[in-house]
Amino acid sequence: EMCIRDSYKGKEGRKLIAVELAPPLGIDDEKIMDAAFLMKESGVDVLTFPDSPSGRTRADSILMAEKVSRETGMCVMPHICCRDKNAIAMRSQLLGAHINDINNFLVITGDPIPSVVRASVKSVFNFDSVGLMNIISDMNQEQFAGEPVIYGGAINQGRVNFKVELERVKKKMEAGATFFMTQPVFSDEDIDRLRQIKEQTGARILCGIMPFVSLRNATFMKNEMTGINVTDEILSRYRADMSKEEGEETGIQIAREIIAKTTDFVDGYYFSFPFNRVHMLKKIIGKNNQ
């Protein structure tokens, strides 16, 4: 069930398509299950599930991935972050996941807990993503020797000190990361930096694409989300009085432009859609990826 590895063995020149589906904040999973089935029809290779991003509690990423895998038969990849669990909880979760055939992971350090809840909730951060990769690497030699876990890391191409990011990518590769998913790409500078990472490390890169659907959506992401560098040029393409359709169309157009500029060197694309608007995917990749 090493589906992410198998997905790369597909047609030469074909890009791997991953789509992020956020687990629900409550227990109603109808929307996420509908989205998963729609993504299956759209020819998506991998579905990924974030691990309570921005410190907001969501349904467990591994359990959600397990249900989606069981019901759709799709390749799934939960994110696991270092914010909420110590090494015992982490190893225990990895063992349980493996027993349930979940053995592809995106390993990230995790966002800090928002200041609002910080008084009542303590972050763990016993280790960062490289430390967690080393734990999985050890487990791959021991418990998982017959069927090792495949894992990748994140690239934050917008990091102020780019040299540091480049070194982090190399460290993650040394710790066994076999692919990377980037923060959403919006500018030519982002693209140049990813190209440099590719040239200097040979890393397998899935380029992050986050299509905004309105000026409000784009402005919120620019101001509130760490690691997402939304340029003024992107903002200027949205108007406050756009219809829902016009907003989506603008997001689709920008996504296509980013794909055109990166297709010569990236290995695939990693989409996250605001407000679960996964129907936009077909209009972005069309038939050219089948």
Question: Where are these predicted regions, by residue range?
Answer:
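C-terminal extensions of enzymes
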Residues: E246-N288
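Hydrophobic faces of well-ordered beta-strands that scaffold small-molecule active sites
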Residues: I17-P23, L47-F49, V76-I80, F105-V107, ...
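Active-site mouth loops of central-metabolism enzymes
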Residues: L16-K31, V76-I88, V149-V164, A240-Q253
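Active-site-adjacent beta->alpha loops and helix N-cap segments on the catalytic face
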Residues: S7, D28-D29, G55-K67, N86-S92, ...
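Short, small-residue-biased leader/transition segments that mark boundaries at the very start
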Residues: E1-I4
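Catalytic domains of carbohydrate-active enzymes, especially glycoside hydrolases
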Residues: D34-P50, E174-G176
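Catalytic-face loop-and-helix region of soluble metabolic enzyme cores
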Residues: G208-D264
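Conserved anion-binding
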Residues: N104-L166, A175, R195, Q200-E224, ...
